[in-house]
């Protein structure tokens, strides 16, 4: 058995790669999981369906610029979280700690260092997040999703790809050509508005919008609105085309399922992460990247028509989660 403490959440981009690796690791060996969550965030809702031990931390990420007065309060909460994490890790006694980024990873990773527990990191973005870069200086191994990410890390780096959580819940078979619009786990008012305009313009197409519980300013017979989609793999496999933000996990899923795509990166992402991630779609010839300020409804409608008529040519791929799980299992159970 492998006892593993995990941190990675707040957004689906950090949460689902962690769950994908745990799912594959459990196929190889029994596991006992302690998952550190952020109070009130996505992972607390999703992890209700998982039989893992959980510890909720009341912390927030630092605001930018970092010299903000608000950060004094947030640093105090992080300090308190450090003590909680140390206490829980001493009690749980994990064989390894596995983190997938986001601010919850930092107190868990630093506690692993203090307790001399081997630390494994998985990075989703082309440009790594600050927490993972800081933690990598004492990590046993860093798994990255893209070759371009290697230069940011100095220790053992494995280009494994981004783990994909494959979760088959529905056999989807759409009669009409169907366009999926997803604004990330938190939704996007911009993409919600875009879905209204496109569904009105392309009446012969069926649109599915994952709204993130944000307001959708229209109703239309050819627009299906869902608050949130957990089984994204079913949808990416079945739709004709997707319009999404440029989160690393989203981009990796689109590549894995060979889904023709239009990426409209969120301009507020840290250090333009989403723009760099989105470039992978154009690099592979899988679709287009359009900046928000350049969005033109007629142009996007034409691109939808073109992409939805493409024949998918992607060959079967090995889920990076399998590669990472095997690597961890082989190192821990030598």
Swiss-Prot record:
Keywords assigned: Cell cycle, Cell division, Cell inner membrane, Cell membrane, Cell shape, Cell wall biogenesis/degradation, Glycosyltransferase, Membrane, Peptidoglycan synthesis, Transferase
Enzyme nomenclature, EC number: 2.4.1.227
InterPro entries in UniProt: GlcNAc_MurG (IPR006009), Glyco_trans_28_C (IPR007235), GlycoTrans_28_N (IPR004276)
User: In which residues is UDP-N-acetyl-alpha-D-glucosamine bound?
Assistant: 11-13, 125, 185, 229, 274
UniProt catalytic activity: di-trans,octa-cis-undecaprenyl diphospho-N-acetyl-alpha-D-muramoyl-L-alanyl-D-glutamyl-meso-2,6-diaminopimeloyl-D-alanyl-D-alanine + UDP-N-acetyl-alpha-D-glucosamine = di-trans,octa-cis-undecaprenyl diphospho-[N-acetyl-alpha-D-glucosaminyl-(1->4)]-N-acetyl-alpha-D-muramoyl-L-alanyl-D-glutamyl-meso-2,6-diaminopimeloyl-D-alanyl-D-alanine + UDP + H(+)
Where it sits in the cell: the answer is:
Cell inner membrane
Q: Name one GO molecular function term.
A: UDP-N-acetyl-D-glucosamine:N-acetylmuramoyl-L-alanyl-D-glutamyl-meso-2,6-diaminopimelyl-D-alanyl-D-alanine-diphosphoundecaprenol 4-beta-N-acetylglucosaminlytransferase activity
Gene3D superfamilies in the record, alphabetically?
A: Glycogen Phosphorylase B
The annotated pathway is: Cell wall biogenesis; peptidoglycan biosynthesis
Q: Name one Pfam family in it.
A: Glyco_tran_28_C
Stretches assigned to coiled coil:
none
| Gene Ontology biological-process entries | carbohydrate metabolic process; cell division; cell wall organization; lipid glycosylation; peptidoglycan biosynthetic process; regulation of cell shape
Q: How does it sit in the membrane?
A: Peripheral membrane protein
Superkingdom: Bacteria
Q: Which GO terms describe its cellular component?
A: plasma membrane
The protein's matches in HAMAP family, at most eight in alphabetical order, are given as: MurG (MF_00033)
Checking PANTHER family in the record gives: GLYCOSYLTRANSFERASE, UDP-N-ACETYLGLUCOSAMINE--N-ACETYLMURAMYL-(PENTAPEPTIDE) PYROPHOSPHORYL-UNDECAPRENOL N-ACETYLGLUCOSAMINE TRANSFERASE 1
Its family remark reads:
Belongs to the glycosyltransferase 28 family. MurG subfamily.
Q: What does this protein do?
A: Cell wall formation. Catalyzes the transfer of a GlcNAc subunit on undecaprenyl-pyrophosphoryl-MurNAc-pentapeptide (lipid intermediate I) to form undecaprenyl-pyrophosphoryl-MurNAc-(pentapeptide)GlcNAc (lipid intermediate II).
Can you say what this protein is called?
UDP-N-acetylglucosamine--N-acetylmuramyl-(pentapeptide) pyrophosphoryl-undecaprenol N-acetylglucosamine transferase
Natural source organism:
Thermosipho africanus (strain TCF52B)
């Amino acid at each position: 058995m492998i006892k593993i403490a995990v941190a990675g959440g707040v957004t689906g981009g950090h949460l689902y790669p962690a769950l994908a690796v745990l799912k594959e690791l459990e196929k190889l060996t029994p596991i006992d999981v302690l998952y550190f969550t952020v109070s009130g965030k996505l992972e607390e809702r999703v992890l209700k369906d998982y039989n893992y031990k959980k510890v909720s931390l009341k912390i927030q990420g630092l605001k930018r610029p970092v010299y903000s007065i608000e950060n004094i309060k947030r640093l105090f909460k992080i300090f308190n979280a450090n003590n909680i994490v140390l206490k829980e890790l001493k009690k749980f006694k994990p064989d390894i700690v596995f983190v997938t980024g986001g601010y919850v990873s930092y107190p868990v990773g630093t506690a692993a260092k203090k307790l001399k527990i081997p630390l494994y990191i998985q990075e989703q973005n082309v440009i790594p997040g600050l927490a993972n870069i800081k933690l990598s200086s004492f990590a046993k191994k860093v798994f990255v999703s893209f070759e371009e990410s290697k230069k940011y890390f100095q220790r053992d780096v494995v280009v494994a790809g981004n783990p994909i959580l494959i979760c088959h819940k529905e056999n989807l078979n759409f009669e009409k050509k169907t366009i999926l619009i997803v604004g990330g786990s938190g939704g996007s008012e911009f993409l919600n508005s875009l879905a209204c305009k496109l569904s009105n313009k392309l009446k012969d197409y069926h649109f599915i919008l994952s709204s993130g519980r944000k307001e959708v300013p229209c109703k239309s017979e050819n627009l299906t609105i869902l608050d949130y989609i957990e089984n994204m793999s079913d949808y990416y496999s079945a739709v004709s085309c997707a319009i999404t933000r440029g989160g690393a996990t989203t981009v990796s899923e689109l590549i894995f399922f060979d889904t023709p795509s239009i990426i409209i990166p969120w301009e507020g992402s840290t250090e333009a992460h989403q723009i760099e991630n989105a470039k992978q779609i154009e690099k592979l010839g899988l679709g287009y990247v359009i900046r928000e300020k350049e969005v033109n409804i007629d142009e996007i409608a034409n691109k939808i028509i073109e992409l939805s008529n493409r024949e998918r040519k992607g060959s079967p791929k090995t889920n990076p989660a399998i590669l990472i799980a095997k690597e961890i299992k082989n190192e821990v159970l030598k």
